[in-house]
């Protein structure tokens, strides 16, 4: 049995769909265990199509596909084509495939945070409208009152994988830090959807899951993975902090405005917030940083929008959705004309939800480190294989990447070969890499000889 979230389910390209599920890392592990004499069957709550999403639930669209889209100039005329991810329309309504006695070996629930695994009613259709249930678990839960852990325990697994805790920091990060760091608050029922879970809550839940699975089968063995840093994935690394091209004249005009604000800041004993821009293609984007003191009341009216603005630094993470916003005139949705005064990321600060600032990223890293310390301790205390997913994702994020049978894999968006089009989840080959990381840990801990999966045999990004 495999317990976890989207990374366990095979979610990729922004959706859960059939082909992705068939290339989930647990299904790959099951096949390799089958080669070694283990069970030949591994059941998954398969989606009814290869698009994903739910037509009757807002916010659950279909998968992203790579398509050639129009490139327009400032007048709206099409001047070329470019490759870009485009989200599909959801293909079907929510289908119920669970029920009494209907168990699935893959218990990965996209969107689940640690404490959701032990929440009764997380698979209740009635609770969906209350925000207390998850449609993916509603699909395959054995009852409206069960929990993910209860359904996993009922299967009395002889071997299990557990990978949970990613979403406890990820939703905060992908929202650009719009949530709250709940460190010190042990009551998840009071959390917002984008909050960082208190590390003690995560540790307690994971301990209870392990003890629950052990109580279901005293002879069970297992592998538990730690949490990768968000700085390892393309959603946070694909867009540079300094992608703004400026002419000499534009740089000079902007410098005049920003230097005046810097002078005002300096006069009241505050640090400067704006860089000196140059005639180049690598100027920093203008962002909102809500940790800054708001000085809008002390600025001339035309500068009031810069009250909590500054230029980004190399330590800020610009989120992937910003790539379609930076350099665009917000009044037209098109590239700026020679007379445009409003340009996203240049004269108009990027919205807070499009940037994970250095301070916000530090909160994510600190929470991740705390989660991982607990995961490591719990693995040791319970004799489980510890899968260092964090180290593997760091390795993937290096320039040299990871080599496999003549193919180089990196964390670069689209071109790196390991991540799907949502920039967060791996593609088939990325999940195969994860499967091999699990296999290495399992073999090391239990003395088994499970063979690696062939990474190159699985699917990558599909080009049109």
Language-model features and meaning:
Residues 1-464:
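Conserved active-site regions of diverse hydrolases
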């Amino acid at each position: 049995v495999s317990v976890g979230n989207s990374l366990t389910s095979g979610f990729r390209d922004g959706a859960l769909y059939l082909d992705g599920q068939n290339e989930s890392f647990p299904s790959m592990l099951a096949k390799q265990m089958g080669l070694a004499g283990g069970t030949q069957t591994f059941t998954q709550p398969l989606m009814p199509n290869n698009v994903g999403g739910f037509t009757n639930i807002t916010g659950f669209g279909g998968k992203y596909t790579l398509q050639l889209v129009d490139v327009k100039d400032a007048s709206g005329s099409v001047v070329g084509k470019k490759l870009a991810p485009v989200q599909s329309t959801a293909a079907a309504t929510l289908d119920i495939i669970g029920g009494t006695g209907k168990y699935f070996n893959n218990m990965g629930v996209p969107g689940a945070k640690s404490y959701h695994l032990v929440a009764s009613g997380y698979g209740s259709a009635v609770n969906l409208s209350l925000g207390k249930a998850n449609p993916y678990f509603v699909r395959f839960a054995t009852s409206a009152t069960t929990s993910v852990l209860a359904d996993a325990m009922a299967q009395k697994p002889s071997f299990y994988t557990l990978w949970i805790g990613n979403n406890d920091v990820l939703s905060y990060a992908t929202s650009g830090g719009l949530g709250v760091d709940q460190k010190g608050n042990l009551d998840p029922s009071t959390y917002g959807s984008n909050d960082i879970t208190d590390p003690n809550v995560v540790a307690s839940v994971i301990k209870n899951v392990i003890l629950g699975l052990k109580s279901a089968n005293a002879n069970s063995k297992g592998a538990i993975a730690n949490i990768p840093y968000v700085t390892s994935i393309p959603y946070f690394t694909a867009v540079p902090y300094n992608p703004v091209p400026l002419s000499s004249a534009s740089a000079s005009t902007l410098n005049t405005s920003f230097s005046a604000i810097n002078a005002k800041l300096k006069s009241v004993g505050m640090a400067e917030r704006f860089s000196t821009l140059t005639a180049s293609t690598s100027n920093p984007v203008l962002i909102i940083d809500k940790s800054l003191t708001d000085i809008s009341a002390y600025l001339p009216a035309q500068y009031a929008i810069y009250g909590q603005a500054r230029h980004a630094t190399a330590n800020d993470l610009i989120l992937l959705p910003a790539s379609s916003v930076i350099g665009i005139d917000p009044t037209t949705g098109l590239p700026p004309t020679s007379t445009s005064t409003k340009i996203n990321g240049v004269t108009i600060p990027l919205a807070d939800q499009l940037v994970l600032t250095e301070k916000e990223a530090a909160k994510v890293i600190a929470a991740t480190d705390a989660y991982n310390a607990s995961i490591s301790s719990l693995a040791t205390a319970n004799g489980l294989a510890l899968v260092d997913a964090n180290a593997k994702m760091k390795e993937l994020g290096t320039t040299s990447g990871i080599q496999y049978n003549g193919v180089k894999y990196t964390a670069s968006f689209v071109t790196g070969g390991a991540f799907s089009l949502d920039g967060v989840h791996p593609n088939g080959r990325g999940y195969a890499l994860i499967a091999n990381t699990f296999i290495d840990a399992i073999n090391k801990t239990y003395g088994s000889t499970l063979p690696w999966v062939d990474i190159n045999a699985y699917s990558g990004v599909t080009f049109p």
